[in-house]
Amino acid sequence: VKDRIALAMIEDAERSGLLKPGATIIEPTSGNTGVGLAWVAIVKGYKTILTMPETMSDERKSLLRARGAELVLTPGAKGMQGAVDKAEELRDKIPGSIILQQFDNPANRAMHEKTTAEEIWRDTDGHVDILVAGVGTGGTLCGTAAGLKRHNPSLKAYAVEPDSSPVLSGGKAGPHKIQGIGANFIPGNFVREYVDGVIRVKNDDAIRTGRELSL
């Protein structure tokens, strides 16, 4: 689903005049959105610099570099906030660069409302009453929930976050091992009116379940 938001954010920035030919796209990422951005950017002729916590997997780093992105690694202890801070620092230094702001960019959420929600509704013949999604930017959960609730107002949507960094639940940010979710801050695309509850998942449970599902 990350390729669709990459395209949406880039084309929105082009239409608004913020992204000009030959520009550099800078974005903090745990890797998922970065893959989509690097792919769309190279097709459209933009340079991509991605800031990422050093604790992300080697596979993610290799995949991003293979897509032509330049990686700038940040201290793992600072989580995604460290990557955000570094991206802003680079933007201020590099002329003609832009941060697409996936955590706050409404084009992220809107794309899921327009496409992901409609695909789920169509493919389930409307037989969906619960949506559960991990929260990184909040775009997937909240955009999809908004679209599905338009079809079924009684649908319930639940956010998943790391138990050791329960920011959405009102707790304190902390280190965790679940890549792609739990940014350690509440992103602008996390819109509480679309969320009916938060599920906290322990590191070991997430890792074990991921391995079981891969078999």
Each language-model region and where it sits:
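PLP-dependent amino-acid enzyme catalytic core
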Residues: 1-215
